Design a protein with these regions (language model features):
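Short coil/linker segments at helix-helix boundaries
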Residues: 25-54, 71-102, 112-146, 161-175, ...
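Generic helix N-cap/helix-start motif at coil->alpha-helix transitions
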Residues: 117-118, 150-154
């Protein structure tokens, strides 16, 4: 079923090409943005999941490993159309947010889960099939941006979601994208989202929200993989 094939999870990794020494975080973004086909992406996701599991075995309280494990499960659920993985990712994101509500990355991951499902399936189907709610996603999205400390990642990812949710909301999406371009790039992921936000701005400046939304879809994780 179509609803089994979608879950959006926040982009919480840094871009580089795959290598044995890569962290789970790096492997996941490589899968999301560098892989040119689904088998390659899944292989990188599997490697990231194994790496996160190994880190958790060494230290069960490792928040970074817990987050990347949840992201990996969500990505796998999206690509394999596994409702079980999709729901498992949600539970993991919720647990991370409950443990630390001020964790901006966990808030963004949960926001992406809800909003991605709504964008892909529509509000009714997303809620019925997966329990995803636009209101929950927007609340987590706004919290993530507020808690993000001016880092580019958070407004950049928010801008993509906002224009996809409402192609008429050009002003808000543009303001977020501009904030991302001007934001602090303390990690590679911030530079990645500055690039994505810059690409979105080009479309937004044309004043065509629907065109900008189409561009945004291709800028999200796995947005350029063939169907």
């Amino acid at each position: 079923m179509r609803e089994l094939g979608y879950v959006a999870v926040a982009l919480v990794a840094a871009v580089s090409s795959p290598a044995a020494a890569q962290s789970p975080r790096e492997l996941l973004v490589s899968a999301a943005f560098s892989a040119r086909d689904k088998p390659t992406a899944l292989a990188r996701i599997d490697a990231a999941l194994k790496g996160a599991d190994a880190e958790i075995a060494r230290n069960p309280k490792n928040r970074e490993a817990q987050l990347q494990r949840a992201v990996a499960i969500g990505y796998r659920g999206k690509l394999k159309r596994s409702r079980g993985d999709v729901l498992a990712a949600r539970r993991a994101f919720e647990a991370l947010v409950a443990a630390n509500p001020r964790d901006a990355e966990a808030q963004m991951a949960l926001a992406g889960w809800h909003l991605g499902a709504v964008i892909e399936l529509g509000p009714l189907v997303a809620r019925t099939a997966l329990g995803a709610r636009k209101s929950h996603g927007l609340q987590a999205l706004d919290r993530a941006v507020a808690l993000g400390g001016g880092r580019a990642f958070f407004p950049g990812y928010a801008s993509l979601n906002r224009i996809l949710l409402d192609p008429a909301d050009i002003g808000r999406a543009r303001a977020l994208a501009e904030a991302a371009v001007k934001g602090r790039a303390t990690a590679l992921i911030d530079r990645v989202m500055q690039r994505q936000a810059g690409a979105l701005l080009q479309a937004l400046r044309g004043g065509n929200g629907k065109s900008a939304a189409r561009a945004a879809k291709g800028l999200l994780p796995f947005g350029r993989l063939p169907d």
